[in-house]
Amino acid sequence: MTGHMVPLLPRRSFLANLLSFGVVTSVGSAFAANVSKAAWPPIDATFLFSADVHTCLISGGVLSPNCAQEGKTDANLLRHVAALNRIAEFDWPTQIGGVATGLAGAGQKIAKPLGLVIGGDMTDDGGGQVKVPGEGHQLLQFSSRYQEGTGPDRVHFPVYNGLGNHDLDQDGVLPHIDWYRRELRDYVELNHRPTVFYKPPVAVANYDIDSDNYSWDWGGLHLVQLQRFGGDTNKGAISGLDWLKQDLANSAADGRPIILFQHYGWDSFSLEKWDPAKMTFDDEGSGHAHWWGDDERAALLAALKGYNVVGLFHGHEHDTPMIYNQDGLDLFKPIATFKGGFAAVHITNHYMDVVLAQARGTEGNVNFLKAFSKRFS
């Protein structure tokens, strides 16, 4: 499979770097800070990223309406888990579609991932709604597949959880209107926020209780989970931008590379606005934003200015593997998890390699779809 990428932002000026053969090289980041590699620990981090899991169980083996037709089934998640667990058996591809990938590590064995980062929409309906507050079936389904464990039905490495609009936009039945999003936020916090009295399964270095944004480090690489998006205030969310500014000032002011994760991106679907002529949201609309607006993106970009952001990984759109550059950011979006999609990433002091991939079959095989590489000077 070679993967063919169609133009995503026809009305907006950006550097596409989207080659139909799936091979992309990079330009410098507008956010690069003055870099002194001796100032931070060595970097040799391999990790996976996946978004849009959309667990769909509502009771027993019953799925939410339309989930089976859309492919949001447990069988498809098991295929995805099998591919993730076998990724270290594969080499970084030397070619995709007969074209050299240009990866710095091409032909080398993929190392066991340090973790799997989730880019939102863990569940399809706010964790799996029930009228009486209780643990939702969809959240149970998610944790039974995407919490580190053994055997063929769970991923075999730590999972860094992230929330999207499907996790956070579902209102509960009065008087428990915030129950479901609180349940999802509690799940993230209990998995990642350490306290004096509690050690979570995947502890992180810096957790913001208000926004549920968090950060951690793999050697000299700084990573930040921004949930739906950095600065989100929808459905009562508290903006994490002040926390982000302080986190970057404390942990990345020395110019070390930074990776960001959130649900929304800069693709045409994420940037939809209301189109009054067509009475719908689309990429030609001039009205209010469907997902996140120009001012919200500008505020996030302002918080990142001056830092060495080497990549942002997102989800939200399900069908198209995307590697593109917008507003000075290198952006990466795999196909949705329930469709088998994920990204494999390797970052060292000297380079960053990314491949977008898709699970194939039930035995853990993988198709590599697109590749990206950039060297650090």
Residue ranges and their predicted role:
Residues V35-V132:
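N-terminal active-site segment of His-dependent metallophosphoesterases
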Residues D125-A249, A299-K305, M322-V355, F372-R375:
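Extended active-site neighborhood of metal-dependent phosphoesterases/phosphodiesterases
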Residues G60-T73, G128-H137, G172-W179, L271-W292:
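Short, flexible/disordered intra-domain loops and linkers
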Residues V6-L15, S29:
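Twin-arginine (Tat) signal peptide motif
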Residues M1-P10, S20:
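N-terminal secretory signal peptides
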Residues F47, T55-G61, Q225, T233-N234, ...:
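Short, solvent-exposed loop/turn elements at domain surfaces
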Residues R86-G102, A106-K112, R154-V155, D210, ...:
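His/acidic metal-ligating clusters that form di-metal
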Residues D52, G120-D121, G164-N165, H263, ...:
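Active-site glycine-centered loops adjacent to acidic/histidine catalytic or metal-binding residues
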